[in-house]
Amino acid sequence: MAMLEIRNVQKTFRTDAKPGLHAGIFHRSGARKAAQELQVLRGVDLTVEKGDVVAILGPSGSGKTTLLRCLNFLETADAGQLILDGESFDLAHANRADIARLRKKTAFVFQSYNLFRNKTALQNVTEGLIIARKMPKEQADAVGMKMLEKVGLADRADYYPRQLSGGQQQRVSIARALVRNPPVILADEPTGALDSHTGREVLGLLQQLHKQGHTVVLITHDNSIAVQADRIIRLEDGQVVYDGDSHAPEAMVQPTLLPETPEKEEQA
């Protein structure tokens, strides 16, 4: 059985009709700026097997980040179904119970770390256990230390984010994601804000997770990152155009399509 199946995911961003420039004049005459639509996902289908590290690769604007956000209900899809470890979720009509069920099985790793600046590495990892799960602090600290050991930062448990390098901060965010032991890790450009050496270290850590039973879905625009995954799924214009061997030439994004610098996609 596949760990994760995605069926017919669709998403269109809409801008509401708004008064045009010089609204005071045009609004009285009835002239308004027309609403616009941008179809970002066009019926995406894919399957991820348990324990795989899969890269979803594509240039800026291809829809890859929006797809990942829909899978974790950070965006609501217009249509689509997610089957995760045998459980089915309607990506267009989820209630709070559905979202809670899904998030018990997934963890999201962001490009920007999103650490609490006034808390230590250990406190960042254990915050959710103590507040959301009401776990006693002593027990939460023990679990948190195990996660920091797993990412090679046990000796930095008392450090604040400002005392950590970018790569170390990303490792803390991964430890925080792992603390609930989710079967699926969703990572959005986790190496995008790092230099190439540190990025390879973080990617190596994500690759190690599949040996511990985790399934990793990694979003990237970078061919050199994607090629290290077990498999590449390439998106262009909101559609899957390649799904297969990560070392095949046709899996790669053409250099002319790559952004000059890594950019965080707002609607892609």
Language-model regions: role of each:
Residues 2-235:
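ABC family nucleotide-binding domain
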